Regions:
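Charge-dense, helix-prone N-terminal extensions
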Residues: 27, 31, 36, 71, ...
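N-terminal beta-strand motif that seeds the catalytic metal site of vicinal oxygen chelate
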Residues: 1-22, 78-81, 132-139
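A short, acidic/glycine-rich surface segment
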Residues: 60-67, 136-138
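Vicinal oxygen chelate
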Residues: 2, 7-16, 44-45, 67-139
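Core segments of cupin and vicinal oxygen chelate
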Residues: 12-60
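Residues in well-ordered beta-strands of folded domains
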Residues: 53-55, 80, 129
Length: 139
């Protein structure tokens, strides 16, 4: 069912080195919206309505009073993004690991859904998954 007024999602995550993070994600095929990108933030485009704001730790602290999570020892969350095929899952994760990311989990095949995950250079956990459209109920 189409949403009348789709909401835009901006996921904000802190990064230690903005240039390194942007280069990493550009290497995975993502682009950045220059309107919301500067020396303190990179607006990575996931879709027409989904974005990931890579914020320098200093900029991130302007939005939250809580301590920034040490991703070497703690999970702050799990970012899951869908792709069009199992092959795209494998390709994206392999590229992530060869361009500065780290292996997070082994591939998981549930038949109707397949996923694999990596850690970006700042330790954020990314799950890349494919789901068989025939198994997704329309609401």
């Amino acid at each position: 069912m189409p949403v009348k007024n789709p909401r835009k999602l901006f996921l904000n995550i802190p990064v230690k080195d903005l240039k390194r993070s942007m280069t990493f994600f550009e290497g995975l095929g993502f682009s950045f919206n220059p309107q919301f990108t500067d020396e303190t933030a990179g607006c990575m485009v996931l879709s027409d309505d989904g974005y990931v704001m890579l914020l320098t730790e200093r900029k991130f602290r302007e939005f939250s009073k809580k301590e920034i999570c040490d991703t070497r020892t703690h999970n702050e969350g799990l970012v899951a993004i869908s792709v069009e095929s199992r092959a795209e899952v494998d390709g994206l994760v392999k590229k992530a690991v060869t361009t500065g990311g780290k292996h997070a989990t082994d591939p998981q095949d549930h038949g109707f859904m397949y996923g694999w995950s990596f850690l970006d250079p700042d330790g954020h956990h990314w799950e890349v998954f494919w789901m068989d459209p025939a198994h997704v109920q329309k609401t």
